[in-house]
């Protein structure tokens, strides 16, 4: 019974994502195709085979936040930086998704993990997320801890040779997916929101 409830929540999350990204027809595909056949914009995973995500980082309040905080509810995780316009647009779309889900009484925890912890301290993350949604959780930590976690999610990122005069930094390029984590702390799916590349 609980599995059916979780599956319904996942379906509604997918529909919300589709509404925001303008790919409504995927909802119809989702209702008629098995997860293994659904290949457009989403990758699924067998939850029984998926390992639990493990990490320990620091949130925007300067407190320890580890992988146990992902258990007990669904979570959406996104990796990025506070100075990227692209990441800002993505998080605002995630905020729109959360609003839709709240109307369906589905509570989803949103976790934003910086890929540039040397710049994005707890204080920087707090000020940044207050402008988007202060219910979002922002995580930073040691460079090696961020790299290990990014590796668990198969996040690809590197610092390019393009210098951004607005941020006075070299651009950090990275893969752009939103990850859905189960209430057991396991990877379920990842989504591409299809935003234009703006930096």
Swiss-Prot record:
Top-rank taxon: Bacteria
Gene3D superfamilies: Glutaredoxin
Disulfide linkage: none
UniProt-listed InterPro entries: SCO1/SenC, Thioredoxin-like_sf
Secretion signal, residue range per the UniProt entry: none
Pfam families in UniProt: SCO1-SenC
PANTHER family (UniProt xref): ELECTRON TRANSPORT PROTIN SCO1/SENC FAMILY MEMBER, LINALOOL DEHYDRATASE_ISOMERASE DOMAIN-CONTAINING PROTEIN
Record-stated family: Belongs to the SCO1/2 family.
Protein name (database record): SCO2-like protein RC0042
């Amino acid at each position: 019974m609980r599995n059916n409830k979780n599956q319904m929540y996942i379906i509604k999350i997918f529909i919300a994502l589709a509404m925001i990204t303008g790919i409504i027809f995927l909802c119809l595909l989702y209702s008629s195709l098995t997860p293994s056949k659904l290949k457009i914009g989403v990758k699924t995973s067998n939850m029984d085979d998926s390992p639990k995500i493990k990490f320990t980082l620091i949130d925007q309040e300067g407190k320890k936040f580890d992988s146990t905080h992902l258990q007990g509810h669904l979570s959406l995780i996104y990796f990025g930086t506070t100075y990227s316009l692209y990441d800002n647009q993505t998080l605002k779309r995630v905020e729109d998704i959360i609003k839709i889900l709240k109307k369906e009484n589905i509570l989803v925890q949103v976790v934003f993990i910086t890929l540039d912890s040397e710049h994005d301290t707890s204080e920087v993350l707090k000020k940044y997320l207050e402008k988007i949604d202060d219910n979002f959780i922002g995580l930073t930590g040691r460079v090696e801890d961020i790299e290990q976690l990014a590796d668990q999610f198969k996040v690809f990122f590197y610092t390019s040779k393009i210098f951004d005069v607005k941020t006075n930094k070299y651009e950090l390029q990275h893969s752009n997916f939103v990850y859905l984590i189960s209430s057991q702390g396991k990877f379920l799916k990842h989504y591409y929101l299809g935003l234009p590349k703006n930096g």
